[in-house]
């Protein structure tokens, strides 16, 4: 991505997936240079990370030992933030955690409703909420 942005600072880039790290981890904040500060995104050719907002609110995509993490993230380049971009534009990011995706009872109440646990099929969807 850095070489694309060097060649074309207005490139439309969406970087999304399970990064196995929170927005504050070194791999995201320092290596990817993903930030919530749009000014830095435009000036330094780095990525915007809208997922930090959820992390700061304690809302997550995955839960382990009662600690929520935002390891599933979306990052976008400055090209998608520019007001004049008429073809593609970043609108918003979110964590899709509707009731049917949430475990209703038991030890993992409130966690994402998993497909499998302990080798047993539970009928759920994933151990992460989609973004």
Give names to the regions the model predicted.
Residues 3-14, 20-131:
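Metal-dependent phosphoester-hydrolase catalytic domains
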């Amino acid at each position: 991505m850095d070489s694309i942005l060097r060649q074309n600072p207005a490139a439309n880039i969406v970087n999304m997936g399970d990064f196995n790290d929170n927005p504050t981890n070194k791999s995201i904040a320092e290596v990817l240079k993903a930030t919530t500060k749009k000014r830095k995104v435009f000036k330094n050719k780095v990525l915007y990370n809208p997922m930090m907002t959820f992390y700061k609110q304690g809302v997550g995509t995955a839960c382990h030992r009662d600690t929520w993490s935002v390891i599933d993230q979306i990052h976008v380049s400055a090209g998608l933030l520019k007001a004049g971009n008429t073809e593609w534009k970043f609108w918003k990011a979110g964590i899709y955690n509707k009731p049917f995706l949430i475990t209703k009872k038991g030890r993992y109440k409130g966690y994402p409703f998993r497909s499998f646990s302990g080798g047993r099929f539970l009928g759920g969807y994933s151990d992460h909420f989609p973004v």
